[in-house]
Amino acid sequence: MKLLGEKFPSMEVMTTHGVKRLPEDYAGKWFVLFSHPADFTPVCTTEFVEFARKAEEFKQLNTELIGLSVDQVFSHIKWVEWIKDNTGVQIPFPVIADELGRVSNQLGMIHPGKGTNTVRAVFIVDDKGVIRLIMYYPQEVGRNVDEILRALKALQTADQYGVALPEKWPNNYLIKDHVIVPPSTDEASANERKEKIKAKEIEAFDWWFVHKPLK
């Protein structure tokens, strides 16, 4: 089981695009690795179509997509062909064939009571090879690709500007598209913030809840 902040383990995998080395082949880029329970299943098909439709948006964020299941590479190839023939959507990203479950077990994608199939896991790995986000969905519930994109944008924004992002950013109920300034770490800076709030020099609910436009 891997944890947030850990390095993504080095591994060599077989995919529909040939052999890949993770995370080395994606050095300098972010990548989203997502597992699905099985090929030729309805929920997984809807997810793959949406990931493919949004693939260019991920690329614009310097991010590559990688699928994974415990199926054989031949099954992946035929399923990808089926998707294109029956939905008109081309799957542009590689899909890992983890038929022995080695990668899935190493990453904690196979959960108790679910047999040898993976749950719907999502790993977001940054351009330094560090695991930044992990999501798990049950086999019976499909993922929201827009939420994965939102989380990716939020992580990159936090890194670039040194801020935190609120619920549903950039459409938060309380502060709309504003970002959250890190809280004061000592009494002096907290008091300074209180004075700025009184003078209406900064936007805040309190000294520990300061927000601002991103730019």
Swiss-Prot record:
Residues 2-157 form the Thioredoxin domain. Homodecamer. Pentamer of dimers that assemble into a ring structure. It comes from Caldanaerobacter subterraneus subsp. tengcongensis (strain DSM 15242 / JCM 11007 / NBRC 100824 / MB4) (Thermoanaerobacter tengcongensis). Keywords: Antioxidant, Cytoplasm, Oxidoreductase, Peroxidase, Redox-active center. It comes from the Bacteria. Belongs to the peroxiredoxin family. Prx6 subfamily. Its EC number is 1.11.1.24. GO terms for biological process: cell redox homeostasis; cellular response to stress; hydrogen peroxide catabolic process; response to oxidative stress. This is Peroxiredoxin 1. The active site is a conserved redox-active cysteine residue, the peroxidatic cysteine (C(P)), which makes the nucleophilic attack on the peroxide substrate. The peroxide oxidizes the C(P)-SH to cysteine sulfenic acid (C(P)-SOH), which then reacts with another cysteine residue, the resolving cysteine (C(R)), to form a disulfide bridge. The disulfide is subsequently reduced by an appropriate electron donor to complete the catalytic cycle. In this 1-Cys peroxiredoxin, no C(R) is present and C(P) instead forms a disulfide with a cysteine from another protein or with a small thiol molecule. It is found in: Cytoplasm. InterPro entries: AhpC/TSA (IPR000866), Peroxiredoxin (IPR050217), Peroxiredoxin_AhpC-typ (IPR024706), Peroxiredoxin_C (IPR019479), Peroxiredoxin_TDXH (IPR022915), PRX_1cys (IPR045020), Thioredoxin-like_sf (IPR036249), Thioredoxin_domain (IPR013766). NCBIfam families: PRK13189.1, PRK13599.1. Thiol-specific peroxidase that catalyzes the reduction of hydrogen peroxide and organic hydroperoxides to water and alcohols, respectively. Plays a role in cell protection against oxidative stress by detoxifying peroxides.
